[in-house]
C-alpha cells in the first residue's frame, strides 16, 4: 500500500463517521488535489479555532478553486466546522465537506 493510499484510508474512515454514504471517489480527487501537503502533520489538518486559517481556506479553496463568492465560502467553511466536530480535522475531509455543501463536485470531474 502506498503512502497516499494509507492517508486516504485514514480520511475515508473519518468521513464515514460523518456520512456513511459519502462519495469516496470525490474524496480521492480532493485528496489528490491537495498534493504533498497531506504528508505534513501540520498542513494536513484544519483548525476551526484559527480565524486566519479559515480565511485562507475561504480565499484559496472556496473562491479560487471552487469559484464561489467570499460570502458563500464563509458560510460553507462555517458549516464544515459545525459538522466536522473532531478535534483534529483532516484537511481533505474538511475540503470534501465544503465541496459537497457548495455543490461544486463538477470542479473535480
Protein language model regions, located:
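Short, compact, well-ordered microdomains
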Residues: 75-109
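Residue-level detector of well-ordered alpha-helical segments, enriched
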Residues: 26, 30, 53, 72, ...
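Core of compact, soluble alpha-helical bundle domains
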Residues: 2-67
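Short amphipathic alpha-helical segments and their helix-coil junctions
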Residues: 7-16, 69-86
Amino acid at each position: 500500500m502506498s503512502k497516499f493510499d494509507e492517508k486516504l484510508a485514514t480520511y475515508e474512515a473519518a468521513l464515514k463517521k460523518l456520512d456513511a454514504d459519502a462519495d469516496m471517489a470525490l474524496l480521492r480527487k480532493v485528496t489528490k488535489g491537495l498534493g504533498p501537503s497531506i504528508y505534513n502533520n501540520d498542513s494536513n489538518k484544519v483548525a476551526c479555532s484559527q480565524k486566519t486559517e479559515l480565511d485562507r481556506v475561504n480565499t484559496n479553496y472556496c473562491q479560487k478553486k471552487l469559484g464561489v463568492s467570499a460570502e458563500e465560502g464563509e458560510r460553507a467553511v462555517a458549516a464544515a466546522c459545525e459538522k466536522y466536530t473532531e478535534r483534529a480535522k483532516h484537511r481533505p475531509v474538511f475540503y470534501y465537506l465544503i465541496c459537497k455543501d457548495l455543490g461544486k463536485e463538477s470542479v473535480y470531474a
